[in-house]
């Protein structure tokens, strides 16, 4: 249900899933990484109050698609803050993986 790159809700806060293994997820909550059971995550389905809906520039859209293609991740962000978080969290990892080919 949750894949790396997905946003989810944990303890009523929006988090991003970094990895999943053995029914656990490593999540990033702000700048804190932690591991939680997948069963403790909830689907992220509503734009947070006061956040702008997604209207990506061509460069942002290209970057998100490239990260997803390189890392096999799925972007499910709903607001512009999610776009920034996703790119900031995974861009360098994506570049390193592409260079390692």
Model-predicted segments: where are they?
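Intrinsically disordered, low-complexity, charged/polar segments
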Residues: 30-54
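Short coil-to-beta transition motif at edge beta-strands of beta-rich domains
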Residues: 1-11
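Basic helix-extension-helix modules of the SAP/HeH family
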Residues: 50-100
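Short beta-strand-centered aromatic/proline hotspots
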Residues: 13-21
């Amino acid at each position: 249900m949750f894949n790396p790159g997905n946003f989810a809700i944990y303890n009523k806060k929006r988090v991003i899933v970094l990895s999943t293994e053995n029914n656990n997820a490593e999540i990033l909550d702000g700048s804190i990484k932690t591991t939680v059971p997948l069963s403790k995550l909830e689907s992220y389905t509503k734009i947070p109050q006061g956040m702008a809906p997604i209207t990506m520039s061509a460069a942002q859209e290209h970057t998100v698609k490239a990260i997803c293609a390189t890392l096999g991740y799925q972007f499910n962000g709903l607001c512009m803050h999610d776009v920034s978080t996703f790119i900031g969290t995974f861009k360098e990892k994506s570049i390193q993986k592409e260079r390692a080919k």
